[in-house]
A protein has these predicted regions:
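Extended repeat-based scaffolds of very large eukaryotic assembly and lipid-transport proteins
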Residues: 1-189
Length: 189
């Protein structure tokens, strides 16, 4: 999949997925997307373009995190916070593994949100009422993660607590987590 300019890179991103680029053992897709032309500038432009599709912006950001040491620059953090909040809103459409399991492990995407720091909190705050379920795949991780019935708001709460260095220990019961999430939300007002 050689890519020669910004428009063909955008088209290539629209035809692929996070799983294709980051979760296959063969990283040929990532390398192909990165190797042709001025991929960095094109990807940065996509991240900053509100007219680009949310999925394209998110995938462009993930590639930049993977390929550019020290990414993101300070002037991109607020924009990235909105992109990642949108990705979390869309998490039920995909497997949740890259977000990690609250209280247990950070996934690749969660690590990137944590790097955004305080700028991510307003966008994540809006997710604390989203009770849609997320699904984990695999064997051990899926069995454990899905038994907890994690939701978008659980992941958002975990990320906010980590950014603010606040306690958040996910209860096995969603109703118990709801109480902890309400307490966390009160600290954000």
């Amino acid at each position: 999949m050689p890519v020669h300019d910004a428009s063909s890179l955008a088209a290539a991103l629209s035809r692929t997925s996070f799983m294709d680029v980051f979760q296959r053992l063969d990283h040929a897709v990532l390398e192909s997307l990165w190797s042709e032309g001025d991929a960095r500038s094109a990807l940065e432009a996509m991240v900053g373009n509100p007219a680009a599709s949310p999925d394209t912006r998110f995938l462009a950001a993930e590639i930049l995190f993977a390929k550019v040491p020290g990414y993101p620059p300070p002037d991109a953090v607020e924009n990235l916070a909105a992109i990642y909040a949108d990705a979390l809103r869309n998490a039920p459409k995909a497997m949740a593994n890259p977000w990690g399991m609250p209280g247990m492990q950070d996934g690749q995407i969660a690590q990137h949100v944590l790097l955004l720091g305080e700028a991510a909190i307003p966008a994540l705050r809006a997710q604390l009422d989203d009770a849609r379920s997320v699904t984990f795949s695999g064997s051990k991780e899926a069995t454990f993660g899905n038994s907890y019935h994690y939701r978008i708001k659980d992941i958002a709460a975990e990320l906010i607590a980590r950014i603010r260095n606040l306690p958040f220990i996910p209860d096995i019961d969603p109703a118990g987590r709801d109480g902890a999430i309400r307490k966390l939300a009160m600290t954000l007002k």
